[in-house]
Every structure is written in structure tokens, then in C-alpha cells.
């Protein structure tokens, strides 16, 4: 196993939320479901899911960079073993989990973690406008 330098490790930790948001976006748009029948060009995917083709291409490339989806020639993408978990109609689907974990109700309270540690109080109300369990 190659040694990953500490700055690179920290970069991966600090930017991990980017991946969560990528997975949530892929799940919400139904990208893996769109590719269920086989590879498609990004323009076709964009039309099917109602997205801007240029923006979607950047998202698909970012997903590919973290091992989700496979990019082929001519801006064509296909599912792989990891993206299959974002399909809605497969056993063990993680699609709804990706949507939930990337939703504001899950990540906004984390924005207030420093204040919660300082005060010892829940910051859910400040982050969400209500307590988590009312």
C-alpha cells in the first residue's frame, strides 16, 4: 500500500462532504437508474433527467473520479459496481440513504458543531429552525 502523505490525507478528510453531495445529487437525479439499460452519452442522460448537459458532465466526471460510474469515449458513461448501489430498484440500494444523508436536515446541524461543543447545547434549532425530535 502506498503511503499517502498527511497533507493529502487531510485534504481527503476536509473535502469528504463534496463526495456526499455528489452521491446525493446522483441519487436525486436518478443517474444510475438512467444508465440501467446500458451506457449513454451525457447529453442523453441530461435530457432524460432534466439537467444541463455541461453541468451534468462535470458531476459525472467528479463521480467517476471517486469510483462511481465509468466514463467511456465521447462523454459516454456507464454504471459500475459502485454506481449500481445508487439504483432504486436493486436489493441493497443505497439511493435513499444517499439522498437522506446529503439533505439539509442531516448536514446543517454539523455546521454548528463548534458552537455545540463550546456551549454543550444542541444547535438543531439554530440550524434547522426546530429541534430534531419535537
What are these regions (language model features)?
Residues 4-50, 54-134:
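Conserved Class I S-adenosyl-L-methionine-dependent methyltransferase catalytic core
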